[in-house]
Amino acid sequence: MQVLKEKLLIHQQVDNWRKDGNRIAFVPTMGNLHEGHFSLVREAKRHAEKVVVSIFVNPMQFNNPQDLLLYPRTMDQDCSQLQNLGVDLVYAPTVEELYPEGSQDITFVDVPKLSTMLEGASRPGHFRGVTTVVSKLFHIVNPDVACFGEKDFQQVAIIKKMVRDLNFFIEIIQVPIVRADDGLALSSRNGYLTSEERKIAPNLYKILKKLAQELSNGNGDLEKLIAETNTELSRCRFIPDQLEICDSTTLEPFTAGTKNVVILAAAWLGKARLIDNIQTTIN
């Protein structure tokens, strides 16, 4: 497995692979890898002969400088695990490599509406940072397919729209959430939980499953269900930050005619902001 930091070398290697008739799959990450990331790699290997994984902690998508500073960097461990999975190339650029003139006054990619609603309203500028860096990585790696995790449901929708709007010839593969045995969605931020909070954290998924069942059965009015769910989260020591019920295709708010819905949730537990989602069908 190669580990490269220079975009020109990445471009050359991928070009050589493609000349030999290989398809290229790409998995962008910020490192601190876990089984959720590894599921993306395994899916990528199903779609292409060569797999590229990027490891880059992107300063543009952090609202809090302290959060950026504290984000775990585990490069040696990550590379060892990726090699065991059969990854062909790791792209690990420096900030200076991707943002040679800094990340403030630069050309950016912004997907309107989708980037400022829901999670985007809580984290202004976050998705603009995501789409800007992903578009840069797409240009450098030039993959045939790219894999993204469904845990970041809104992010996947935004990436798909960016790909359509900007005519990237890249297939976006949406990979299901990977959960611990107790139901907690795997996330790098789970490492911020204390041992006691870790025992509480699976309740987020359990409470969302209960809400999904109520919706699926057509029970109750929406405002009441959301209020009851937030109350239940608070009882479990969560601080609810976001709870939205949306059309799973458009992410528009739920209406009487909506059949396929996604419940999007974010809640603080100690220092960790946990996100999760569940899709369901209204009968």
Swiss-Prot record:
Q: Which UniProt keyword terms apply here?
A: ATP-binding, Ligase, Nucleotide-binding, Pantothenate biosynthesis
Return the broad EC class.
Answer: ligase
Q: Which GO terms describe its cellular component?
A: cytosol; nucleus
Supply the EC number(s). Answer: 6.3.2.1
* MF (Gene Ontology): ATP binding; pantoate-beta-alanine ligase activity
The record's annotation in Pfam families points to: Pantoate_ligase
InterPro entries, alphabetically?
Cyt_trans-like, Pantoate_ligase, Pantoate_ligase_C, Rossmann-like_a/b/a_fold
What pathway does this protein act in?
Cofactor biosynthesis; (R)-pantothenate biosynthesis; (R)-pantothenate from (R)-pantoate and beta-alanine: step 1/1
What biological process terms from GO does the record include?
pantothenate biosynthetic process
Q: Which family does it belong to?
A: Belongs to the pantothenate synthetase family.
Annotated protein name in UniProt: Pantoate--beta-alanine ligase
Look up and give the organism this protein is from.
Answer: Schizosaccharomyces pombe (strain 972 / ATCC 24843)
The gene it comes from is pan6
